[in-house]
Every structure is written in structure tokens, then in C-alpha cells.
Amino acid sequence: FLSVAGAIMMVLALNFGGFAAILTALFIIGLGFSLQQTAAQPFAIALGDPATGSHRVNLAGGVNSFGTMIGPIIYTLALFGSTKVTDAQIASLKLDSITILYSCVGGLFFIAALLFIFSKKLPAGTSESSVEKSNKATRVLIIMTLLIFGFFTPAFMSYIGVDKMNNEQSQYLSQLHDAYSANTTSVGNRQNVLFGKVFENYNTDKTLLTDNSKSALDSLIIYDASGQEKLNSSIKSIAVSFNDLNKTIKHDLEVYRLKWLFAALAVIVISLFYANARAKKSSAGWGAMRYSQLVLGMLGIFTYVGVEVTIASNLGTLLAQPEFGNMPAATIAPFISVYWGSLMIGRWAGAIPVFNPSKSMKNFLLALVPLFGFGVIIGVNTIANNNMSPLYWYVICVLVQIAGFFISQEKPATMLFVFAAFGIIAMVVGLFTTGIVSTYAFLSGGLFCSIMWPCIFALSIAGLGKYTTQGSAFLIMMILGGSIIPPIQGKLADVIGIHQSYIVAVVCFAYLAFFAWAVRGILKKQGLDFDAQLEGGH
């Protein structure tokens, strides 16, 4: 119902509100999504035997990924009446169409809510076990959250300051241009063209002009025809200096924002390790924080969600680069679809044990289902008139994933390590190549992320006993990685370039490989067989 309220508010904001109202509506819709995701995992587990609960989570995740894959196709049809759109059509999209779309979204959420309310065969979804108190852990997490907001605020406020300065700068340049035009003589037309190049080369997404630049421009207002050549040279020189100034200011500003984002990341890491260290000395009031596997797993969930989101979030910008073919926005959809479809492929394969097949049938399905899933992706996009020919050879990446399934043999620690290692290799290949090879490498990140959630979850809550419910809540909280890691990559891209910024994904996969390795020793010290005992945990 929260998402329904957000959709209703979005309709009102589009018709009667402003930008702030639209952002508020998006926040409410997003909050509804996060609550649904939080409730979905325990609900899926409660639907049957807990031993196969994580496989049902994979199945639900596969359905979710399928929706994510076909969603862009559906809303493109809804908004434009066709799956083929141009950048010009996107730019000229009217608000009326978006209003209808959000009305439909709100209606679908309302119907889904009614189905859950009135269905008599669904479990209550409540737990009879009491949640252990952890006042000290709660206090640390609250302080951590406040500090994150505190560190994010300066980064976001910098955008407001830049907008204000840009407005002042635009007014100054406009006045200067008018004054210049008023003082031109017979050569005015040519000079106006030259002066216009200053504005073409000047990117206003920066800060105020320096005093020197202002003085230089002011000196051009008064001139005569005999100074035309000198004027031409001066305008070109100022245009170049403007570009250099812009690059310097933007670089410094993005570094400033990046520092605040890294500070927020440091707060999360320090807070969790501080809580774990204090809990080991005296467990009273710390609850599940005393378990190292949980704390490392919280960072694992944080990193996993972050890398899954950041690969896709920056993919459109990456493919628009010259070394990737300068793809326009209208042609990027199939690649985004394949990425989210890759997540679907792995989760479908991870859900096979739900149906209790024989060992031979399981192995057969483990090889068949990923290929079938890839066929579904190609088929859906082909029906939508998307050109999928550049992506046919992506099947090689799917075969690598299938090999990973057979190597890991459904053992959570082994599976997590194998797929994290594959992720590292894929991201490194993507960094050191360009074109379709690099694109395939980055897209395959979806394949290798697809099975990580249940592996991390099972390994993190192993051996928690009465703290299992609390530990699960702590783990779900760490999906906030999806709101921190993508901005870090985005700001890093502004500093070192979008292609090179994918080093962030390498670091994320490297931590996940480390977690898979470290958790083995932690659980072994606690007397747990991390693979045999948790085999049902995948």
C-alpha cells in the first residue's frame, strides 16, 4: 500500500506539483519497494520446508529479474506505442503519458495487496520466536545511519550551490553578450559568430567565471573594425581558457564529493568492526554482532547489492563512449535487458532444487536452464524489435556460468568464491579491453552476481542460533550498499573516466571472494561444516 500511495502522489505531483514533489513521490515508491524486498525473503522461506527456503528465494528472485528484464520493453510500449524510439521522442515525451503509466503501476500494486490480504492459503508470515535485545548494537547502527546522512549532505548540497552560481554566471554572460552586440559595427555579424563559439565551448555546469576571465571579456566590448584580428585571437584564447577552467573546477568539485562518499563508506566499515570487537569483549547488549561471520556477511550483502546495481547504473554511460560505439540511448535497451536477464538466468538455475529432481535430472537441468533462460532473453527482445545480433555470442559467458555451477556443486562457500573469482576476471577483462569484448565482460557481472545473495545469507547466519532472526534483519539492512557504491563509481567516473571507474566492481568482487575464503575458517572454529551442513542453504 505504501507503493500505491507513492504512485498516487506521483500522479498528483506530475499534474499539480513541482520537482520536489516528484522526488518525494519517488522516495515513497522506493521505500515501498525496499519494504517489499525486506518482507519477501522470510515470506518465501515460510511458504514451505525451511531446508529448501533459499531455493524458493532464488525462484522469486528469478521472477523478479524476469520482470526487470521485460519492464523496459513494456513501459516503452506503454509510453510510445512502439519498442523502437529515438532520442528525440524521449526528449519530447509528454507528462500525460507518464501519468497514465504511474496510474497503472498504482493499480497493479493495489491488486497485489488485495490478493495477499484475502488469500486464505498463504502463511501468516509472523515468527513466534522472540528477537533478542541488542541495545548497544542498535545504538551503533543509529549513529552510523546519522553519520551517513551527515556525510552525504555536503555532497548533495554542492549541487545546489553550483546551480545557483550557474544562474548568476548565465545572467552575466547574457548581459555581456548583449553589450557586445550593441557595440558591434559592420563586422558585427562575424564577431557575433565568433563570440557565440565562446558560449558553445563553455560548459555552464561549473562555477562562476574568474575575475580575470570577466576582465578579459569586458575588454572585448569596446573595439573598432581595425582590431578585428586581435579580437578574433582574443575570443579563441578565452574560449580555450574557459574549457581549461571548466575541467579544473569540475575535477576539484567531483574530488570533493568523492571524499564525502568515501567518508560515508568508511563510517559503515568502522562501525561494524567496532561493534564486533566490543561484542567479543562483552556480549551483553550486542546481540548477533558478536559473530564475525555475520559482520563480514553484512559487508558482503552491502558489497553484493552495490556491485549488482552499479554495473547496470553506469552501463548506459559506458556504452555511449566512442570506444564502445557511441551508442545512442535508444539502442542501449537490449544490453541493459541482457544484464538483468543474466541475473534471471542464474536464479532460475539456483531454484532447480525446489522441484526435487533426481541427481541426473538436476545436472541436466543445470546445463539446460541457463541456456533456456538466455533463449528467453533473446526471444523477448527480438519480439520487441530489438537488434540482438551483437549479443548472440554472449552465450559463451552463459557456458562459463554453467561450468561454475558444476565446479561449486551447490556448496555455498565454494560457490561464492568461484563466482566472485569469475566476477574479478570478467571486470579486469572489461577494464583492459574495449568494444564488444569489454561489453560482454561487464554484462557477465550479472551472471556471476545472480546466485550470491542466498550464499552470503546462508553463510552469515550459520551458527547464530537464537540470534538468527536478528542477524537476518541486520543483513537485510545492508542493501543500502545499492545507494552508496553506485554514487561512488559515478563520482569516480567524473574524475578518472567511466571505463576506468569499473575498478569499483573489481574491488567489490574481491571482497566477496575474501568473505568466501574467510568465513570458512570462522565457521570451522565454531565446529560448523560450512559446506556439508549448509548445502541446503544455497
Please report, for each region that a protein language model flagged, where it lies by residue:
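C-terminal membrane-cytosol helix-exit motif in multi-pass small-molecule transporters
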Residues: 71, 75-84, 103-130, 140-163, ...
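Extracytoplasmic gate region of multi-pass secondary transporters
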Residues: 71-72, 76-80, 147-203, 210, ...
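Multi-pass alpha-helical transporter architecture, strongest
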Residues: 112-121, 382, 405-409, 506-538
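Glycine-rich segments within core transmembrane alpha-helices of 12-TM secondary carriers
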Residues: 52-83, 472-485
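C-terminal ends and interior cores of transmembrane alpha-helices
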Residues: 2-16, 374-388, 404-409, 422-434
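Hydrophobic core of transmembrane alpha-helices in multi-pass small-molecule transporters
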Residues: 19-36, 393-401, 437-452
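Loop-to-transmembrane helix entry
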Residues: 250-260, 295, 324-339, 363-368, ...
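Intracellular juxtamembrane helix-capping segments at the cytosolic ends
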Residues: 35-49, 312-315, 450-465
